[in-house]
């Protein structure tokens, strides 16, 4: 089946698909304080989703392309779930968030198919994969159209990997008690086995969102990157996120001695946002298998346990948390009680001495991850490093912060 035919088949209207903002039904969508964060973007009036320009541009999307798609959504006069929110158009049609971003992805998919130069074709496939992922964002459970966009993103990513430098292998890992999970091992040029970074991504991202991290920071240093999806999304969708948040990553770590391309004696974990919750758990529970752990904007305690902090977080992000926990209809109080159990301090881990070297990068006044969370991580480590990343200029400082983190990982890993 051709890629174009697959798109037509997946998105063929069958019934009235639920609109994304209606999938979690607990929170009152009232006025909220404006939020701006380097890793999560910012709240913009009249949008349900946070607009994450920095990360989308970092992944290779042109800022003008973002504005063009937003404009198409804004200009639509189709029926919306909430007339005050542009990105709540009902049904797969013009103006719907998933429709517009997927349509943009198909443009690049067609360019990729028409391009004869393999590397340029690979770039176009990667661009399409990123746009399909934005279409599926924020990846709420039960969002049928988003899941179809994710399937197209994975297909495009596999096409890109066949054409881009280095080697990528799709790997299946067995997890006792449930379905196996699929990960991607990205390997630089040269002979393995390679020192490897196990990526622990945020809850609102897919494993295929981190190719830029591999290409710009790890591959030039001869470091491989292994990704898996977080529980409840993508290739890990059959697994619910639980208080044992590192379960899937632990089973992957235990399998690495049997992966010939990975030097299992030189493995690091790198956690973005809630992925840092996973990475720090690994530092405590799997210290013999991990050389180092690095975190960026970690969600390990305050957001999970402080009601005032939760009140400052946008509706969309709380919906993501509720969706991952399988609490689509729970009360606010029930969600607060459950989130508290995910705090690594409440679990009795953070605060105890940890032998694994840990670095944590943070931004001042980050609504999702205060400085205290990063200090708690680094002060718990026998070899901790605290890294403050200035906010402005946001893109340059983000890049500089990632370079410093990669330097730190390389020094201890290689």
Swiss-Prot record:
InterPro entries: AB_hydrolase_fold (IPR029058), FrsA (IPR043423), FrsA-like (IPR010520), FrsA_esterase (IPR050261). It catalyses: a carboxylic ester + H2O = an alcohol + a carboxylate + H(+). One of its GO terms (molecular function) is carboxylesterase activity. Its EC number is 3.1.1.1. Signal peptide: none annotated. Keywords: Hydrolase, Serine esterase. It is an enzyme of class 3 (hydrolase). Pfam families: FrsA-like. Catalyzes the hydrolysis of esters. Belongs to the FrsA family. PANTHER family: DIENELACTONE HYDROLASE DOMAIN-CONTAINING PROTEIN-RELATED, ESTERASE FRSA. This is Esterase FrsA. It comes from Escherichia coli O6:H1 (strain CFT073 / ATCC 700928 / UPEC).
């Amino acid at each position: 089946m051709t890629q174009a035919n697959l798109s037509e088949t997946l998105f063929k209207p069958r019934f009235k698909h639920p609109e994304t903002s209606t999938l979690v039904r607990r929170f009152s969508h009232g006025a909220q304080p404006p939020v701006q964060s380097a890793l999560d973007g910012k709240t913009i009036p009249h949008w349900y989703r946070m607009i994450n320009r920095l990360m989308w541009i970092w992944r290779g999307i042109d800022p003008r392309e973002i504005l063009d798609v937003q404009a198409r959504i804004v200009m639509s006069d189709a029926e919306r779930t909430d007339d005050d929110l542009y990105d709540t158009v009902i049904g797969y049609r013009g103006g719907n968030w998933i429709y517009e971003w997927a349509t943009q992805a198909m443009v690049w998919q067609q360019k990729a198919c028409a391009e004869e130069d393999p590397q340029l074709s690979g770039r176009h496939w990667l661009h399409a994969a990123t746009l399909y992922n934005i279409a599926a964002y924020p990846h709420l459970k039960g969002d049928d159209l988003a899941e179809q966009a994710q399937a197209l993103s994975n297909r495009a990513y596999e096409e890109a990997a066949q054409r881009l430098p280095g080697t990528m292998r799709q790997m299946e890992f067995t997890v006792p008690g449930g379905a196996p999970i699929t990960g991607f091992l990205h390997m630089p040029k040269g002979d393995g086995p390679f020192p490897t970074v196990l990526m622990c991504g945020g809850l609102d991202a897919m494993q295929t969102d981190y190719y830029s991290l591999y290409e710009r920071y790890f591959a030039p240093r001869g470091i491989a990157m292994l990704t898996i999806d977080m529980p409840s999304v993508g290739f890990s969708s059959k697994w619910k996120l639980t208080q044992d948040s590192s379960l899937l990553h632990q089973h992957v770590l235990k399998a690495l001695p049997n992966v010939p391309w990975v030097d299992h004696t030189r493995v690091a974990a790198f956690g973005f946002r809630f992925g840092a919750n996973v990475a720090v758990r690994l530092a405590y529970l799997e210290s013999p298998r991990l050389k180092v752990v690095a975190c960026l904007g970690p969600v390990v305690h305050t957001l999970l346990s402080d009601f005032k902090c939760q009140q400052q977080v946008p509706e969309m992000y709380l919906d993501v948390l509720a969706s991952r926990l399988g609490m689509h209809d729970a009360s606010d109080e029930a969600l607060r009680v459950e989130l508290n159990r995910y705090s690594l301090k409440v679990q009795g881990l953070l605060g105890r001495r940890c032998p694994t070297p840990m670095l944590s990068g943070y931004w001042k006044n980050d609504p999702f991850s205060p400085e205290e969370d990063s200090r708690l991580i680094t002060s718990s480590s026998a070899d901790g490093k605290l890294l403050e990343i200035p906010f402005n200029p946001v893109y340059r400082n983000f890049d500089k912060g990632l370079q410093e983190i990669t330097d730190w990982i390389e020094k201890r890993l290689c």
